[in-house]
């Protein structure tokens, strides 16, 4: 029963933090340590992220259907190849390549060295400041309809940084999008779509490690956490898309810096283990 209660809390944390630029993987590493539960493991973290990505699939189902259909048609009908949705399909595929290749190449490092709270606290602060600068200096004249192959590659490279817990997949992509001149809504929407292949792929790949490996929980608690993350994540998407139409990322920047600094202090004083 304790495992299920812990999984429920972790699913709630995942759902609340996955789409905000504050790093869900960092929260799933930091808060279990604060609660005395220990590290839930990279496999658990990757698998419950499937729940939030299913929320993306549901929320953007019309966009995804339109993009997928146009992309498939473009493979056989030349007249579709210049269509925005067909190009968007290619941009998402190309933008996913960096994180897939690096994720496979650095798997052992990601599951061990990258989970150090020293590193996570530092990346929360540094990438939080980067997000703040990007949001402050970035233009607001480009919409998602103006995305180019170059921009898709650059945002894909930025997303790959999120293999380090504390960076934040959405935070890295949003930062690059804002620096490239996209408005907040466009950068946010594209960040959600770009994450789908990588996150679902990583979650499926890690399914084999749920009953063993470094995972603290079995199938039951993991399924509970995944369902909770889906429900909460769906609500978080709707809220964030409304929020970014009128407000800046400043509150997220302040929160990241505060959490990162607190994490480093707690580790340095021995309150929690690195």
Swiss-Prot record:
Catalytic activity: di-trans,octa-cis-undecaprenyl diphosphate + H2O = di-trans,octa-cis-undecaprenyl phosphate + phosphate + H(+)
GO cellular component, as recorded: plasma membrane
Spans through the membrane: 40-60, 90-110, 114-134, 147-167, 190-210, 221-241, 252-272
Localization per Swiss-Prot or TrEMBL: Cell membrane
EC number: 3.6.1.27
Superkingdom of the organism of origin: Bacteria
InterPro entries: UppP
Primary enzyme class: hydrolase
A Gene Ontology molecular function term of the record: undecaprenyl-diphosphatase activity
Family: Belongs to the UppP family.
Function description: Catalyzes the dephosphorylation of undecaprenyl diphosphate (UPP). Confers resistance to bacitracin.
Further details from the record: Bacitracin is thought to be involved in the inhibition of peptidoglycan synthesis by sequestering undecaprenyl diphosphate, thereby reducing the pool of lipid carrier available.
Name of the molecule in the record: Undecaprenyl-diphosphatase
Provenance organism: Nocardioides sp. (strain ATCC BAA-499 / JS614)
């Amino acid at each position: 029963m304790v495992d299920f209660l812990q999984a429920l809390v972790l699913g709630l944390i995942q759902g609340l933090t996955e789409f905000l630029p504050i790093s869900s993987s960092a929260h799933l590493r930091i808060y279990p340590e604060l609660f005395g539960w220990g590290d839930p493991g990279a496999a658990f973290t990757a698998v419950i992220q499937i729940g939030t990505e299913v929320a993306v699939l549901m929320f953007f189902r019309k966009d995804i259907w339109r993009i997928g259909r146009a992309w498939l048609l473009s493979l056989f009908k030349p007249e579709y190849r210049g269509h925005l949705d067909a190009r968007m399909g290619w941009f998402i595929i190309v933008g996913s390549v960096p994180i897939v290749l690096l994720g496979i190449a650095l798997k052992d490092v990601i599951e061990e060295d990258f989970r150090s709270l020293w590193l996570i606290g530092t990346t929360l602060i540094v990438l939080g400041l980067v997000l703040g600068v990007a949001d402050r200096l970035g233009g607001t004249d480009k919409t998602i309809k103006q995305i180019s192959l170059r921009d898709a590659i650059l945002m894909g490279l930025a997303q790959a940084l999120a293999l380090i817990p504390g960076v934040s997949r959405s935070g890295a992509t949003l930062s690059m999008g804002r620096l490239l001149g996209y408005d907040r809504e466009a950068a946010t929407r594209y960040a959600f779509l770009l994450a789908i292949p990588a996150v679902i792929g990583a979650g499926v790949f890690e399914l084999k490690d749920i009953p063993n490996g470094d995972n603290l929980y079995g199938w039951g608690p993991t399924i509970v956490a995944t369902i909770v993350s889906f429900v909460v994540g769906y609500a978080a998407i709707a809220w964030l898309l409304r929020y970014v139409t009128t407000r800046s990322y400043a509150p997220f920047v302040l929160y990241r810096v505060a959490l990162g600094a607190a994490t480093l202090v707690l580790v340095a004083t021995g309150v929690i283990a690195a």
